[in-house]
Amino acid sequence: MTNIRKSHPLLKIINDSLIDLPAPSSISSWWNFGSLLGICLGIQILTGLFLAMHYTSDTATAFQSVTHICRDVNYGWILRYLHANGASMFFICLFLHVGRGLYYGSYIFMETWNVGILLLFAVMATAFMGYVLPWGQMSFWGATVITNLLSAIPYIGTNLVEWIWGGFSVDKATLTRFFAFHFLLPFIIAALVMVHLLFLHETGSNNPTGIPSDMDMIPFHPYYTIKDMLGALAMILVLLTLVLFSPDLLGDPDNYIPANPLNTPPHIKPEWYFLFAYAILRSIPNKLGGVLALVLSILILIFMPLLHTSKQRSMTFRPLSQCLFWLLVADLLTLTWIGGQPVEHPFIIIGQLASILYFSLILILMPFISIVENYLLKW
């Protein structure tokens, strides 16, 4: 008699993707972040659902409703801080997941990679809209500045911005629609995750060597279920440490001041996970140019399969490419730091140089070094 998990129509799907899934025997802890992202999404949807039960998306009461959640709702404070810091954990895992993909050449699976980029954009949009909801100073001015960037689009820009705002400024209509979309998008993200996994399971996982591992596969359960549980435990430990000891570490103090359209904060900046893109935006003096650079800083990932000139898939055996990869990581950390600094000397020039280096590394230096490595290996 066949085991029910292999014959039942629903259990069969779960079995084929979580239990009997053939996985390469050599995948390292860098392959843990997919499951961690799934856990992050689950935490965000659950905490968000309970927060939405007490939140009101009205400009007059939004700030008060968040205060009410923290002060009066049973365990409301932990829900709020789990949700806020859960977003930070989500992005840490996302950046590490994408970084792993770049290092080990996972972008060769083009369908999986492209759905992943779509997921990245969806998560960024969700996080941005979520940051507006508490209706503090940084929420209001962040929403004003970022949505205003669309006015740089020729001809339709101004109309587009007013259409998104639902009026002539960020107001009640904007807050209400942002709440609606912030609630809806995570479920769309969950559906996209299914598509992402569907494409991944068509090809099977990559591995650190970049060499096909079809002849050396092991079942996902128990080997990788236990490994993922260890990763999940570590991530939850970090998240709870952050929530229980320093919940406002990654937030902005200005967001504890209720939104005031008549008073602009001295330094408008987004959450830390957008600072690298914000620095690239600010480093170009032209508005349209800045917006294009901002979009391209993420969209450039789409071109990775086309920019892959090496005869090897992974960077494991390519020391020159490894140097450039870690230079790119250092450059992104520099951009993140610059994004949080005021627009003055020497931060302006550092930001401009870091932005030039970012695009040069991805578009010119890394493909060129790969060709050099091919030549050195006489390929």
Swiss-Prot record:
Gene3D superfamilies, per database record: Cytochrome Bc1 Complex, Chain C
Cofactor binding description: Binds 2 heme b groups non-covalently.
Membrane recorded as keyword: yes
Transmembrane annotation, as ranges: 33-53, 77-98, 113-133, 178-198, 226-246, 288-308, 320-340, 347-367
Key words of the record: Electron transport, Heme, Iron, Membrane, Metal-binding, Mitochondrion, Mitochondrion inner membrane, Respiratory chain, Transmembrane, Transmembrane helix, Transport, Ubiquinone
SS bond list: none
A GO-annotated cellular component: respiratory chain complex III
Binding site for heme b b562: H83, H182
Localisation per UniProt entry: Mitochondrion inner membrane
Positions annotated to bind a ubiquinone: H201
GO molecular function per UniProt: metal ion binding; ubiquinol-cytochrome-c reductase activity
GO BP, sorted A to Z: mitochondrial electron transport, ubiquinol to cytochrome c
Residues annotated for heme b b566 binding in this entry: H97, H196
Recorded superkingdom: Eukaryota
Remaining remarks: Heme 1 (or BL or b562) is low-potential and absorbs at about 562 nm, and heme 2 (or BH or b566) is high-potential and absorbs at about 566 nm.
Functional summary from the UniProt entry: Component of the ubiquinol-cytochrome c reductase complex (complex III or cytochrome b-c1 complex) that is part of the mitochondrial respiratory chain. The b-c1 complex mediates electron transfer from ubiquinol to cytochrome c. Contributes to the generation of a proton gradient across the mitochondrial membrane that is then used for ATP synthesis.
Family the entry assigns: Belongs to the cytochrome b family.
Subunit structure: The cytochrome bc1 complex contains 11 subunits: 3 respiratory subunits (MT-CYB, CYC1 and UQCRFS1), 2 core proteins (UQCRC1 and UQCRC2) and 6 low-molecular weight proteins (UQCRH/QCR6, UQCRB/QCR7, UQCRQ/QCR8, UQCR10/QCR9, UQCR11/QCR10 and a cleavage product of UQCRFS1). This cytochrome bc1 complex then forms a dimer.
Name of the featured protein: Cytochrome b
Species name: Epomops franqueti (Franquet's epauletted fruit bat)
Gene: MT-CYB
